[in-house]
Amino acid sequence: MENPPNETEAKQIQTNEGKKTKGGIITMPFIIANEAFEKVASYGLLPNMIMYLIRDYRFGVAKGTNVLFMWSAASNFTPLLGAFLSDSYLGRFLTISIASLSSFLGMVLLWLTAMLPQVKPSPCDPTAAGSHCGSSTASQLALLYSAFALISIGSGGIRPCSLAFGADQLDNKENPKNERVLESFFGWYYASSAVAVLIAFTGIVYIQEHLGWKIGFGVPAVLMLIAALLFILASPLYVTRGVTKSLFTGLAQAIVAAYKKRKLSLPDHHDSFDCYYHMKDSEIKAPSQKLRFLNKACLISNREEEIGSDGFALNPWRLCTTDKVEELKALIKVIPIWSTGIMMSINTSQSSFQLLQATSMDRRLSRHGSSFQVPAGSFGMFTIIALALWVILYDRAVIPLASKIRGRPFRLSVKLRMGLGLFMSFLAMAISAMVESFRRKKAISQGYANNSNAVVDISAMWLVPQYVLHGLAEALTAIGQTEFFYTEFPKSMSSIAASLFGLGMAVASLLASVVLNAVNELTSRNGKESWVSDNINKGHYNYYYWVLAIMSFINVIYYVICSWSYGPLVDQVRNGRVNGVREEEELIDIVGKGFEKEDLSPVVKTN
């Protein structure tokens, strides 16, 4: 049975019936512009921020990187909170509006740190003889961190809600072209997001490097103001939907209910349907036998005390449906594979060190006659370009060509794609270590051991391969994981499927900080120069990269084990496969067994 609409939903239905003229294509420019401007503004701040912290706030490399790790963790965690508040309390329009204003205020505060000399340490040259440069005060840091916090809160409200809010405006079941309209919107939405990030990594970074922090921080603030105004001024045009109970609440209820009934005994036969609470129209009459201790959450211990006359549970924190129990089990089941993506996110979060490398190298496009220098913070665009090219070529060229050659549909299984992405991430860190070893030797041989600001006679284009590999890793693993979650979860859990990768990035930022602090602490003992020294030529960033590369290789092996242990995917079971593979299919090895090859001819092998 389905819950009847509550009073809020009933009023909303009546309201929408009388306002059929709201929503539609006319709202799209405002919603897409809000998301795009927010991305240009926020992503444009990150690439060069380590230089701002080092030069203007006198942070060391390790401390500055840790601050950015924390900021990244907050920016990736707040979308979960934003999605919960939007679904359960505020609604999408109000959440996006508040978040847009929060981002704008945060960027204004950050701009003020560049405009007002008194809110940061006085200018000082630490290399000058007899200079004693003071560090940042608590009040100065409070203003800086407040700016970061407000920007993170803004990201947490805009990013999880914009896509869904746009779909609300176009979702008209009476329109025979509804699916096509939604597909077109999703395409434009993601295209605008990709363009926005590219503009951030090129245009905003270029402004910061050539026109200074005052204009470099002022432009994002103005863009965010435009984004907020465009979105809010179009409010009369929007369709707004009432809030509902968050899926996170339902999962929490299942955990609490299972704990409260932990002392109860489960029935001997799992097909005792009358023992378990379920909706009349539910396909799940009894929970599965995996993770059986959670089955107690839907076990009816006293029908009179737990179920009302209307058939609904009187206390959902003591008795929940079989569907909620199975949703919780599905979430727990994917956690091992989800955790394998954390290491890749740790690797891609090392942009501060990569920027310092690029700053110390020759960034001219051509070393013969060219004066244009690629901004150090713009090298991240190669990651975005590689990601976009792979997605386009895989969908438009690789799959059609392979399918034509084989005479039947072809695709790489989602497990194989995730594994290949993790292996690419390992290669990216190994290449990073080798390039840094070469750069460091060059710097020392050219007499720059004590001068971290010197430009070494080596092209920064040597950094491009590692950026490209990071892009391919994200294209394979990040997209693969999202697809994996969507296919393995029930349809009701689609919002969690979209949030899990972001949560992994938040955890990765925290763990990256732990790894960095451990390396810094262990390698600087007894007065030794830290591997992550403020002086890039005295430190050993290459050793630090090798640590990450070794961890990445171990992670690939861990993924193989998790992939093998997970068993067949939902689609494979649905298609009636035996043990998750067809008779003509075989396992593909990268570093061991565990990647199921789907729809590949036996003559095609990958080593």
Swiss-Prot record:
Expressed in shoots, stems, leaves, flowers and siliques. Mainly detected in larger expanded leaves, in the companion cells of major veins. Its main location: membrane. Keywords: Cell membrane, Membrane, Phosphoprotein, Transmembrane, Transmembrane helix. The chain crosses the membrane at residues 65-85, 96-116, 138-158, 185-205, 215-235, 374-394, 418-438, 460-480, 496-516, 544-564. GO terms for molecular function: low-affinity nitrate transmembrane transporter activity. It comes from the Eukaryota. The modification Phosphoserine is found at S601. InterPro entries: MFS_trans_sf (IPR036259), POT_fam (IPR000109). One of its GO terms (biological process) is nitrate transmembrane transport. It is a multi-pass membrane protein. Disruption phenotype: Nrt1.11 and nrt1.12 double mutant is defective in high-nitrate-enhanced growth. GO terms for cellular component: nucleus; plasma membrane. It is found in: Cell membrane. Pfam families: PTR2 (PF00854). Low-affinity nitrate transporter involved in xylem-to-phloem transfer for redistributing nitrate into developing leaves. Not involved in dipeptides transport. Belongs to the major facilitator superfamily. Proton-dependent oligopeptide transporter (POT/PTR) (TC 2.A.17) family. This is Protein NRT1/ PTR FAMILY 1.2.
